[in-house]
Design a protein with these regions (language model features):
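Basic, polyanion-binding surface patches
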Residues: 2-186
Length: 186
């Protein structure tokens, strides 16, 4: 630990403060990257689309709100993901939010080499044609605005068009390599 004097002119509490010594910095390699982000909790959604060759969908933890006006979101999808060709060709998509008890749906849509829309998945189509998960407590329909190749992923930006909520729900999270739920502090 180091002791540092605070500048009374810029601090509301003049005096001394104890701050930790500088941490050892390391180069970020793939293992470090994975380790750091395993500790970053993220919401879990299933993104679905259809470009005319049948439904495709995948589990995502990369959904980000980007803009309020216009309402934009973004998400990342691997360049090798089986759903990428459909997402790349689709003009629109659905973001299916999952509740805390729906980790089996999240796992199914994260599994490679299976028909994710086969039983026991319950799904239907919106009147606009996109596949939507019948058990999702809420969803957003988005119109694809941009696609960018970034590293080993593609970033997709979608303008949100419609929203429906079947019920209020506690979100499903992903943290430290497993599904989790919120535990409010207060």
């Amino acid at each position: 630990m180091s002791v540092h004097a605070l500048n009374p002119a810029t601090s509301g509490n003049p005096g001394l403060a104890v701050v930790p010594d500088r941490l050892e910095e390391r180069t970020v390699d793939a293992d470090t990257f994975r380790s750091v982000f395993r500790r970053h909790a993220a919401g879990v959604v299933v993104i679905t689309a259809d470009a005319g060759h049948g439904p495709a969908g995948f589990t995502a933890t990369s959904l980000v709100s980007v803009s309020l006006l216009p309402p934009l979101v973004s998400f990342a999808i691997s360049t090798t993901a089986s759903s990428w060709p459909t997402v790349n060709a689709a003009d629109s998509l659905v973001i299916n939010f999952l509740d805390a008890g729906q980790h089996e749906i999240a796992s199914r849509f994260a599994t490679s080499g299976i028909d994710r829309f086969a039983e026991p998945t319950r799904w239907s189509r919106l009147h606009t044609g996109e596949p939507v998960l019948d058990e999702a407590p809420s969803y957003l329909r988005g119109l694809v605005e941009h696609r960018f190749s970034v590293g080993d992923h593609h970033i997709v930006v979608a303008r949100l068009d419609t929203h429906a909520e079947r019920r209020e729900h506690e979100p499903l999270l992903y943290h430290d390599g497993r599904y989790a739920t919120t535990d409010p502090l207060v």
